Amino acid sequence: MYDQVTLKLNVDPLILSALKEDITSEDVSTNSVMSHPQQGEVDLICKEDGIICGLQVFERVFTLLDENTKVEFFVKDGDEVKKGELMAKVHGDIRTLLCGERTALNYLQRMSGIATYTHSVAALLKGTKTKLLDTRKTTPNNRIFEKYSVRVGGGNNHRYNLSDGVMLKDNHIGAAGGVKKAVAMAKEYAPFVRKIEVEVENLDMVKEAVEAGADIIMLDNMSHEQMQEAMKIIDGKAEVEVSGNVTKENIARLTDLGVDFISSGALTHSAPILDISLKNLHAV
């Protein structure tokens, strides 16, 4: 759940932008059939099993349209929900309920889908020391929602933005003239409290990263045999992250290597939505 400062400064402007995108000048369909205020109620129903996430954002869509809208929740973020389950009732002006329906559901379906998919992957890491991380491969202007959803699903957030930590990827290394030079420059520039992570693609780069004193070494798109050799080279001198081609099918083999982190862009860019709907709208 977002605190009030985050909600007002960071979340509300994004929701308002989404509402402006959808409503523009008016909701011509609603205004065609509802010319006067009329109080109503509608049910929020889950249409498949999953992990619910984004209830605060769902509610905020309606209250930004009309502060008198009330939502009665029967579940909370992180709960496992079942197909057909009644999760909430929304009370308010029917025009508000109709105007906000699609935007509210878009957020809730997307966030719940990410939480559900993350939960299924995180379950495969239980009993191991390996932590599941997301990436910055998020939908533009939706990172605050998508990374929150990863946490609700049982994953962990990697960098939120470029200010959060030093990650030297292939192009940084190329621009600097090599792994050792890149790490040395980062150590000189970045505050000492910031860890320095280096992305490596082969065993020679692994050796350079270790010798340069990198705090975290990311093994990117390496074969299983290469990763086994890399772990021997690193030998506890740095934390190890694995990224690239991470699937539910191969994740057990990755944890067997003893890596500290597994990062997956799929948590945010490939998670399917959770099917949720607003049904049974009626006047009260």
Give the label of every model feature segment.
Residues Y2-A212, I216, Q228-I233, E239-E241, ...:
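Acidic/glycine-rich phosphate/pyrophosphate-binding loops and surrounding catalytic core
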Residues N221, G244, G265-A266:
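Short secondary-structure boundary segments
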Residues G236-E239, L281-V284:
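Short acidic, glycine/proline-enriched helix-loop-strand junctions
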Residues E241-S243, L278:
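Short glycine/threonine-rich catalytic loop with a Thr-x-Gly-x-Asp
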Residues P272-L281:
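Structured adenosyl-cofactor binding patch, chiefly the S-adenosyl-L-methionine
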